[in-house]
């Protein structure tokens, strides 16, 4: 079996160089890989189903939660959802509607907490389909459909503010190593609480 962790390069194109493409698929882990349970399993059209089954079993044995996609799509599932939200967040910052701090607060103090318990689809079921349809009709036409990075992101790139690695992005990071350490510590705590609550 040959697997790629990429979610940005087209898997069918990578498989063109292989003698046995039926043994190839994507196994997309998420950072930090030792903590995030989900791993996307992405077969191409020629992937043998037994390779998918073997990969799913291996990941489960490693304590992961494998999720098999039916076919490759650019970015796979998690990054498509993540970047749909990031695109809207960048637009709100670029339009002066919200600050980066406010965007992150909405996620860490509201949506992230709710979605850690119930995903967006089950949250929709809980709220009810009729209100979801009404809100979608109202909001969808005004959501960002930008097909290129918003200026606020391009300006960070051009100014050399590349994020934690350079000590500054949307925020300043006087101690870059502490950012990942804090993230890992808090993620471990959240995962422990969720595991205990689910029994």
Predicted regions and their residues:
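Short glycine-/small-residue-rich flexible loop motifs, especially phosphate/cofactor-binding loops
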Residues: 12, 56, 89-90, 105, ...
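AAA+ ATPase "lid" subdomain C-terminal helix
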Residues: 83, 93-95
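Rossmann-fold dinucleotide-binding core
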Residues: 4-80
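NAD(P)-dependent Rossmann-like dehydrogenase/reductase catalytic/cofactor-binding core
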Residues: 64-67, 95, 100-199
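Structural/interface elements that position substrates and couple domains in central-metabolism enzymes
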Residues: 78, 82-88
């Amino acid at each position: 079996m040959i697997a790629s962790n990429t979610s940005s390069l087209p898997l069918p194109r990578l498989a063109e160089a292989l003698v046995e493409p039926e043994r190839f698929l994507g196994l997309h882990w998420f950072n930090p890989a030792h903590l995030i349970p989900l791993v996307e399993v992405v077969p191409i059209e020629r992937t043998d189903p037994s390779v998918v089954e073997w990969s799913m079993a291996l990941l489960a044995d490693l304590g992961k939660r494998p999720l098999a996609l039916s076919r490759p799509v650019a970015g796979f599932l998690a990054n498509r959802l993540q970047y749909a939200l990031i695109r809207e967040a960048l637009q709100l910052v670029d339009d002066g509607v919200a600050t980066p701090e406010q965007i992150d607060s909405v996620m860490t103090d509201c949506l992230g907490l709710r979605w850690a318990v119930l995903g967006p689809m089950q949250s929709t079921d809980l709220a009810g389909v009729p209100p979801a349809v009404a809100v979608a009709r109202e909001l969808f036409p005004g959501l960002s459909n930008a097909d290129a990075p918003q200026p606020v992101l391009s300006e960070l790139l051009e100014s050399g503010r590349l994020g934690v690695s350079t000590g500054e992005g949307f925020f300043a990071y006087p101690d870059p190593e502490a950012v990942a350490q804090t993230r890992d510590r808090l993620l471990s705590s959240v995962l422990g609480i969720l595991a205990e609550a689910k029994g």
